[in-house]
Amino acid sequence: MDFPQQLEACVKQANQALSRFIAPLPFQNTPVVETMQYGALLGGKRLRPFLVYATGHMFGVSTNTLDAPAAAVECIHAYSLIHDDLPAMDDDDLRRGLPTCHVKFGEANAILAGDALQTLAFSILSDADMPEVSDRDRISMISELASASGIAGMCGGQALDLDAEGKHVPLDALERIHRHKTGALIRAAVRLGALSAGDKGRRALPVLDKYAESIGLAFQVQDDILDVVGDTATLGKRQGADQQLGKSTYPALLGLEQARKKARDLIDDARQSLKQLAEQSLDTSALEALADYIIQRNK
């Protein structure tokens, strides 16, 4: 199976898992649950669930067990996008080629849906059937996702990003923003897959962290590049939005060609990290393919 087929299979699997966890919720057919479904299920590359599945499968964990952490990390990602798009944040009206949640359902429902998706993520990790995961590892997974999505991770990065609007931000400060805002949840996805495998996954965490940190930063560099060279129809969101908000970006600081080189160098670093796992007879091909895709994608 080539990478596009793997990614397509992941999208299908992750969406089935998300639907299964959303379906039993109360208040079905109300605007807030419809907003949750719209924000979580319509479109998206599902890269974070892919990282959960790919890492877990590398250690022999079943898809059935990995559905829960894959759905949980995507719930956090979906909530973050819903809230990022709000007028008080990035004020975007287009996401994945469709009206953003607050445009379609109103700000109140968008806020509540984001809140509900965030808490659903932790309900999934605490309650879902994960037969191969010990209680110790389940608690570690909950703690990992909480840290990555809170003030020590994604929320802290978003706060730094908002504070930096309209200001000149040096490269080290820009990397600090994105290691938190984007990179923390990507690292969490990899770690959740590893923690699903117990001790053998835990032993690989230092290597996997290096891989995840490299692809997380590369993902943001490529996003910044696409904000310059992409188009709204392909991106599914407003092209040039970062420039309009006065945000510092890698192309603005480094120039377009040097930004591209930085992204390539980061992916080379990620691939180098995986060699240590390949030497242990682990199949890293899916993680390698995902790393390459990050800088080859056009949206």
From Swiss-Prot:
One of its GO terms (biological process) is geranyl diphosphate biosynthetic process. It is found in: Cytoplasm. This is Farnesyl diphosphate synthase. Isopentenyl diphosphate binds at residues 45, 48, 77, 96. It holds the Pfam family polyprenyl_synt. GO terms for cellular component: cytosol. Disulfide bonds: none annotated. SUPFAM superfamilies: Terpenoid synthases.
